[in-house]
Curated annotation (Swiss-Prot):
PANTHER family from the UniProt entry: UREASE ACCESSORY PROTEIN F
Chief site of localization: cytoplasm
Family: Belongs to the UreF family.
Record protein name field: Urease accessory protein UreF
Gene Ontology cellular component list: cytoplasm
Role played: Required for maturation of urease via the functional incorporation of the urease nickel metallocenter.
MF GO annotations: nickel cation binding
Top-level division of the source organism's lineage: Bacteria
Disulfide bond entries: none
Source species: Cupriavidus pinatubonensis (strain JMP 134 / LMG 1197) (Cupriavidus necator (strain JMP 134))
Keyword Cell membrane on entry: no
Length: 230
């Protein structure tokens, strides 16, 4: 695939218009706003940046690389193992529902669009529950997107959804949100670099230590007033 074609595929996959429901989740951000941990643009940006560097970069991003490599080699056993591992690390009902729903929606879209070979689509369709990183990595392989570029799109899409949630729930202005997203570019790149290093180790150095995220997600389940599903 030419670089330009790969770029267009990346833009398609990272688009907010992709019908997988990312706009309906905040991954604990709304609960952080409710208790006052996040209260303005500065604290929202710090929250999202720290989540990238200390949560995504240490677990989900390196695991995404392992899933991409599994799909690339059509090592279905490895894909299933890492998919199950990631699902087991979702500490609350809301976080499990989020990755299951978005993963299922993207896997269904891959089949409907006819992306990738028959074997990839068939194996993806029968993984249940299929987590979002598993489905996104499979889609990148199907669209011939390299692992670093695919992971950058995955992380940027995550950051963009977080900024959109902050705009609605803090609330913030649209321009403030764009300034925030622009300043997060470097954090996305740092997340990719850290993930590459962690995925290269034997065994891969994955850490799920994020107790505040689990507590906030649990709190969000009974939050009185909320806009988001997580």
């Amino acid at each position: 695939m030419t670089p330009l074609r790969q770029l267009i595929s990346l833009l398609h996959l990272a688009s907010p218009a992709l019908p997988i429901g990312g706009f309906s989740y905040s991954q604990g951000l709304e609960a952080a706003i409710d208790i006052g941990c996040v209260r303005d643009a500065d604290t929202a940006e710090r929250w999202i940046r720290d989540s990238l560097l200390y949560v995504q970069a240490q677990c989900e991003a390196p695991l995404w690389l392992l899933l991409h490599r599994g799909w690339q080699a059509m090592d279905v056993d490895a894909v299933r193992e890492w998919n199950g591992w990631f699902h087991a690390t979702r500490e609350t009902a809301e976080l499990r529902l989020e990755t299951e729903q978005m993963g299922w929606s993207l896997a269904k879209l891959v089949g409907q669009m006819g992306w990738g070979g028959d074997a990839l689509r068939e194996h993806l369709a029968v993984i249940s529950p299929v987590c979002l990183p598993t489905a996104f990595a499979a889609t990148c392989v199907a669209l011939e997107i390299d692992e670093r570029e695919g992971l950058a799109a995955y992380c940027f899409n995550w950051a963009e959804n977080q900024v959109a949630a902050a705009i609605k729930a803090v609330p913030l202005g649209q321009v403030a949100g764009q300034h925030m997203l622009r300043r997060l570019h470097e954090a996305v790149l740092m997340t990719v670099d850290e993930a590459v290093q962690r995925a290269a180790e034997t065994p891969p150095r994955l850490s799920t230590f994020s107790p505040m995220l689990g507590l906030l997600s649990s709190r969000h389940e009974t939050q009185y007033s909320r806009l988001f599903r997580s």
